[in-house]
Amino acid sequence: MKDPKFTHLYEMAKKELLEDILPFWEKYDVDEENGGFYGVVTREGMPVKGGTKCLVLNARLVWTFASAYRILKDEKYLKLAKRAYDYFCEYFIDKQYGGCYFMLDCKGNAIDDKKFVYGQAFAIYALSEYCRATGDTEARDKAVAIRDLLEQHAYTPDHPGYIEILARDWSYNPANQGSNINPEAEATKTMNTHLHLIEAYTGLLRVLRTPEQIAKVRQHLNIMLDKVYDSEIHHFKMFFRDDWSWTTPEISYGHDIEGTWLMTETAEVLGEKDMEEKSAPKCLAMAAACLEESILPDGSMIYEYNPVTRHINTNRSWWVQAETVVGFLNAWQMSGEQRFLDASLKAFEYIDLFVVDHEYGEWFTMLG
């Protein structure tokens, strides 16, 4: 018998997806003038003239509509997925050097052609899911091509991991490294990029189960568990030098709770008992630390904490609240501990009350 709280959470989430989120993008974001989807729309759903088109958003659109079609079997989502995929392949993929541009203008011209590894990860993730949903192996081949470029140019074998930024031609400039989430941080390697790389490589493993891909996913999981995860405090470190020595003490609770379910998923897809046994206790410990340290009485999760200065960033970001729901739900499924399901449900109730824009649709970006 299913837990009634889980059933309630499931029904709320399903309603939000099918009656708010997906319809908003279908109704307001299709760019009939320039192709693909608008980069920016107003709260009311009006396109912002001249709005740029970002690699991360467009990759996520490919992933979202492909995933929606795979699960819901509704042909309208296949049509939207194909629209997103076709635009992505035509305009974001660099035909000369490979990989993907980071930013386009509204007409599809590259205005930031750097190869952010974080962005390439989203491209692999999107193309892999499109293949998984449609059976189109050409999408998988495109994902593999990007993976191979990352392995050739971004991977650092002396201290296994991946650098942050390369030029359009994949050349590397040590002075041009930094975090996409905090440009001021000293960072050759970051938690955020590696978190999305493990997500991307796991997605590719679902459609490319080769010894090479299995080995890379195993390595990614070990990097997250051994280098990024701090077993003393049960949190991720965020910013690192090339040798994996960390540079700043901040804790990002949203990334932590996101990491708990992503690493669980990776271990499950990998299907190796020793990696599941290594990953599970660390994921649960981090979920417990997030629950104890970052959840406010209303069920929301704070953004960030610096244990040295004791500064707390209490802003409530949309994505942090979404990851709170998923991460605590995963922790409940792993452990059976009711406190995690309660926290997941309360986080979604907070989202429904404050984050969802019930007047115009979709979600607010940030709450104070």
PLM features: residue spans?
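Glycan-recognition and catalytic cores of secretory/periplasmic carbohydrate-active enzymes
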Residues: 1-368
